[in-house]
């Protein structure tokens, strides 16, 4: 790319809308055929303002897509054992088809133990070890929603990953690690980077595809990006700022996701899609 060219924006909002419209049509069909609408249970521990906002947003999106939502608000003093009891109850409730535990839950909660209380058939957020293993082996199951949304966006823009060098900056269990596995499944050569990586900039400069998912505002600079690279900014920091220095990268990348309007809407769209799929599976509706 020349210095005067700018990257094409990857429109997560528009592509997410199409996914949600398809999910809504499937939800309506399920309701018509079974008399039961798909149901997503959201579980929130405490009253962190950002988490409250995220849950409210997800429930609103459910309503627009014809998905029922059941909200369980637990006090900040909830113990891991109490949270596990709540999640186990929802896992055994036939009226609930998907379960979302909003995280982080607080430093006193063993989140991994809590996630594992979610039945795999209802793990529509793709957070359990079962879901990660199924995804890694290419078996049926639910993917982590943000990685799933990223892959759908890459597909929508016809990004050929075979033989490409993809650098994932971040190694969280629900974003960095799974998106790397999904990229690998598309025949990309994947490098993971993290807080202990020596000379991060040099690593990123070798990438054909960059996924920034570390939660550090503007960590990825313009000079870090190979001209013509595809840049996925999965970070979201205060002030609507991602992990990528957007303005600086805009004149070097070929494709880039904006923040907001890129990865975020795709994450919610995949959550709704997987909730509908979970309901279809549990209610015996072939799609």
From Swiss-Prot:
Protein name per UniProt: Bifunctional protein FolD 1
EC code: 1.5.1.5, 3.5.4.9
Lineage of producing organism: Bacteria, Bacillati, Actinomycetota, Actinomycetes, Kitasatosporales
HAMAP family (alphabetical): THF_DHG_CYH
Source species of the chain: Streptomyces avermitilis (strain ATCC 31267 / DSM 46492 / JCM 5070 / NBRC 14893 / NCIMB 12804 / NRRL 8165 / MA-4680)
Superkingdom of origin organism: Bacteria
SUBUNIT field: Homodimer.
Annotated GO biological process: L-histidine biosynthetic process; methionine biosynthetic process; purine nucleotide biosynthetic process; tetrahydrofolate interconversion
GO MF annotation list: methenyltetrahydrofolate cyclohydrolase activity; methylenetetrahydrofolate dehydrogenase (NADP+) activity
Entry-linked SUPFAM superfamilies: Aminoacid dehydrogenase-like, N-terminal domain, NAD(P)-binding Rossmann-fold domains
């Amino acid at each position: 790319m020349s210095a005067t060219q700018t990257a094409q924006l990857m429109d997560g909002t528009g592509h997410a809308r199409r996914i949600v419209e398809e999910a809504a049509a499937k939800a309506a069909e399920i309701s018509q055929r079974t008399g039961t609408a798909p149901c997503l249970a959201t579980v929130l521990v405490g009253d962190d303002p950002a988490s409250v906002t995220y849950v409210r947003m997800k429930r609103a999106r459910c309503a627009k897509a014809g998905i029922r939502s059941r909200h369980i608000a637990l006090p900040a003093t909830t113990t891991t054992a109490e949270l596990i009891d709540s999640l186990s109850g929802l896992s055994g409730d036939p009226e609930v088809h998907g379960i979302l535990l909003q995280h982080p839950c607080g430093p006193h909660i063993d989140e991994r133990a809590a996630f594992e209380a979610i039945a795999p058939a209802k793990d529509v957020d793709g957070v359990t070890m079962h879901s990660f293993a199924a995804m890694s082996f290419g078996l049926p199951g639910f993917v982590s929603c943000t990685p799933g949304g990223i892959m759908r966006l890459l597909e929508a823009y016809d990004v050929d990953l075979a033989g490409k060098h993809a650098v994932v900056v971040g190694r969280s269990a629900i974003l960095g690690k799974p998106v790397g596995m999904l990229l690998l499944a598309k025949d990309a050569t994947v490098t993971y980077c993290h807080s202990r990586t020596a000379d991060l900039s040099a690593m990123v400069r070798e990438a054909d595809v960059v996924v920034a998912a570390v939660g550090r505002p503007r960590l990825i600079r313009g000079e870090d990006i190979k001209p013509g690279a595809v840049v996925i900014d999965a970070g979201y920091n205060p002030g609507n700022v991602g992990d990528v220095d957007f303005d600086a990268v805009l004149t070097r990348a070929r494709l880039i996701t904006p923040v907001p309007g890129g990865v975020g809407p795709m994450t919610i769209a995949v959550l709704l899609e997987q909730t509908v799929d979970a309901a279809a599976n549990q209610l015996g509706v072939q799609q």
